[in-house]
């Protein structure tokens, strides 16, 4: 049985590091696993990622931003995620639909019902079997994100969201926690302020629970 798992959280929460460690863990168990990210994961998605995350000479309105994220996701689902699951390969995805619901819905103010409808069309109603939410104070995450950018040439930085103020990131955190309360069966909240090995052990516990479940289809 192949499972689809998304890794979510504010900037600097460490989800990307934990995704890589989780993939390594599953491979030690001889479980076929692929890793991917949003926006990205496909040639089209990478071009859209470059537009969305790199600072440029133009502004992107919230509506255009939303449509670009969802367009990248539509291609990603059909080109990468669904074919991989059909082959029996687990997929670990760095952000998925919840990120759009939070960043563009809760924070940018785009109508959340419209986002859900648009996203359902783009994904053919696909949802992760499990979503790991890496939670920590927004100030801590933003500090980590800024440290991560140190030494990276300015024209190579994917930092458009990191450049937002603390209030923006606090709203992102609140939005994620609200989603986790609404869909508590799918979400698992992980204390991302802990050290990397401790967080990894908790991630592995959740993966072990998932792989011991009786076979079932995707939500």
From Swiss-Prot:
EC number: 2.7.4.9
Positions of ATP binding: 9-16
Tree of life domain: Bacteria
Catalytic activity: dTMP + ATP = dTDP + ADP
GO MF term set: ATP binding; dTMP kinase activity
Biological process annotations from GO: dTDP biosynthetic process; dTTP biosynthetic process; dUDP biosynthetic process
Gene3D superfamilies: P-loop containing nucleotide triphosphate hydrolases
Keywords from the UniProt entry: ATP-binding, Kinase, Nucleotide biosynthesis, Nucleotide-binding, Transferase
Enzyme class: transferase
InterPro entries: P-loop_NTPase, Thymidylate_kin-like_dom, Thymidylate_kinase
GO cellular component terms given for this protein: cytosol
Name of a matching Pfam family: Thymidylate_kin
Similarity comment: family membership: Belongs to the thymidylate kinase family.
Function statement: Phosphorylation of dTMP to form dTDP in both de novo and salvage pathways of dTTP synthesis.
Stored NCBIfam families: DTMP_kinase
Name the UniProt record assigns to this protein: Thymidylate kinase
Species annotation: Syntrophus aciditrophicus (strain SB)
Gene: tmk
């Amino acid at each position: 049985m192949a499972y689809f798992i998304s890794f979510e959280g504010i900037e600097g929460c460490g989800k990307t590091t934990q995704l890589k460690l989780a993939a390594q863990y599953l491979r030690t168990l001889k479980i076929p696993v692929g890793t991917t990210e949003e926006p990205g994961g496909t040639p089209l998605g990478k071009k859209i990622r470059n537009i969305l995350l790199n600072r440029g000479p133009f502004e992107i309105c919230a509506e255009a931003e939303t449509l670009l994220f969802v367009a990248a996701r539509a291609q990603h689902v059909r080109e990468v995620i669904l074919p991989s699951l059909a082959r029996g390969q687990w997929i670990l995805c760095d952000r998925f639909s919840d990120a759009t619901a939070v960043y563009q819905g809760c924070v940018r103010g785009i109508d959340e019902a419209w986002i859900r409808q648009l996203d359902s069309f783009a994904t053919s109603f696909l949802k992760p079997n499990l979503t790991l939410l890496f939670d920590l104070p927004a100030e801590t995450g933003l500090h980590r994100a800024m440290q991560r950018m140190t030494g990276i040439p300015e024209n190579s930085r994917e930092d458009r969201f990191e450049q937002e103020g603390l209030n923006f990131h606090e709203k992102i955190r609140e939005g994620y926690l609200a989603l986790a309360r609404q869909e508590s069966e799918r979400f698992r909240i992980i204390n991302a302020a802990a050290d990397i090995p401790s967080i990894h052990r908790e991630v592995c516990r959740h993966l072990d629970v998932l792989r011991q479940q009786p076979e079932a289809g995707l939500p």
